[in-house]
Amino acid sequence: MGITIVLGSQWGDEGKGKITDMLSQQATLCCRAAGGHNAGHTIVHENITYDFHILPSGLVSPSCVNLIGAGTVVHVPSFFKELASLEEKGLKDAGKRIFISDRAHVCFDLHSIVDGLEEAKLGGRKVGTTGKGIGPCYSDKAARRGVRIGEVLDEAVFERKLRSLHAGYTARFGELQYDVEEEIGRFKDYRKRLVPYIVDQLAFFKQYKDSPNTLVEGANALMLDLDHGTYPYVTSSSTGLGGAVQALSLNPTSITSVIGVVKAYTTRVGSGPFPSEQLNEYGDKLQSVGREFGVTTGRRRRCGWFDLVLCRYSQAINHYTALNLTKLDILDDFDEIKVAVAYVLPDGTRLTDTYPADPEVLEKVKVEYVTLPGWKSNTMGVKKYEDLPANARAYIEYIERELGGVPIKWIGTGPARDHMICRE
């Protein structure tokens, strides 16, 4: 089994869906390793737009079987709603090609309510979550009181554990706008509907042990990783290479490539440090031209210049074998383009390839930039590297050199499925 892993290299929203969609055309399996319906990406295929949240985007490929792995959290109503949307858009057999590990955890509406209450308590220091209940669900998992997907099938166990969860949160927060008996009633229907989707993950993988190509689709990104991201302004799962290996029980020796997806500039949704953020006309232009609004929340994304310090750190953690640089065309109309090359700490220390763990330190760094000339010409839809303007190629090759020679193998030049340059 050859395994390709696609990972976000920044703070998410890099455009992982398109490269995953492209690679899934040759894949037998496509797997989600972590996260829940807080993730979001869009794929345009044959003029139809598909929005993915919890489902793997390999479902667009008719020959690809898909798995939601043990490291994920699944909001069951959203699972069925998203699946129905895909089927309505023409993917009629999607329900026959999607499976869920029995070890994945259930994200309840209760978790979403608690998410909002916890954010409100933080006040001005709120994390800026999606409000989907992901954090509280992973907290319950870590505290060993969560409900696994496989346990939904045992009615008595399921009801006992959900009532216990509700009692615990009621003791903490008081009366909640949540009817646990109503939720239990809804799951009587979901229980029957879930049966054909739930699998033992190891047994499932054994069926595909001779698969020539397995694709792992990362959710979120390295800088949102619970351990390695800008904690506490992170998600609640392990979003890097190690998390994918752990969640899917992958054999590390079978991993043939690790693809880092990185925007040609930088964006972030929600709170937290963002050293290269541009709170000026440049940031506004990136946001406007790039149509930077979250797929899941609709929130306006914060925008800034490409950050080499961040990406060197990301490379050191995830060990990318190749990169996919996305949304190059958004930079088409800039006279000059800046790249962050170093952080200077308040004490004068200059950092180029390490990333401070303390978010308050990150808020105080001064950023050093190099300025590169723009290309002032249209790159949207360009499919050959040699057809790019010289300054666009210079920008790509500068980033490539500064990241230690990790090849930028794919370059996104627009939203459509075929707006991609492949450099062999």
Swiss-Prot record:
The keyword Iron-sulfur does not apply. GO terms for molecular function: adenylosuccinate synthase activity; AMP binding; GMP binding; GTP binding; magnesium ion binding. Mg(2+) binds at residues 13, 40. Pathway: Purine metabolism; AMP biosynthesis via de novo pathway; AMP from IMP: step 1/2. Belongs to the adenylosuccinate synthetase family. Its EC number is 6.3.4.4. It holds the Pfam family Adenylsucc_synt. Plays an important role in the de novo pathway and in the salvage pathway of purine nucleotide biosynthesis. Catalyzes the first committed step in the biosynthesis of AMP from IMP. Disulfide bonds: none annotated. Substrate binds at residues 295-301. GTP binds at residues 12-18, 40-42, 301, 327-329, 412-414. One of its GO terms (biological process) is 'de novo' AMP biosynthetic process. It comes from Aspergillus fumigatus (strain ATCC MYA-4609 / CBS 101355 / FGSC A1100 / Af293) (Neosartorya fumigata). Keywords: Cytoplasm, GTP-binding, Ligase, Magnesium, Metal-binding, Nucleotide-binding, Purine biosynthesis. Binds 1 Mg(2+) ion per subunit. This is Adenylosuccinate synthetase. SMART domains: Adenylsucc_synt (SM00788). It catalyses: IMP + L-aspartate + GTP = N(6)-(1,2-dicarboxyethyl)-AMP + GDP + phosphate + 2 H(+). The active site is at residues 13, 41. IMP binds at residues 13-16, 38-41, 130, 144, 220, 235, 299. It is an enzyme of class 6 (ligase). It is found in: Cytoplasm. HAMAP family: Adenylosucc_synth.
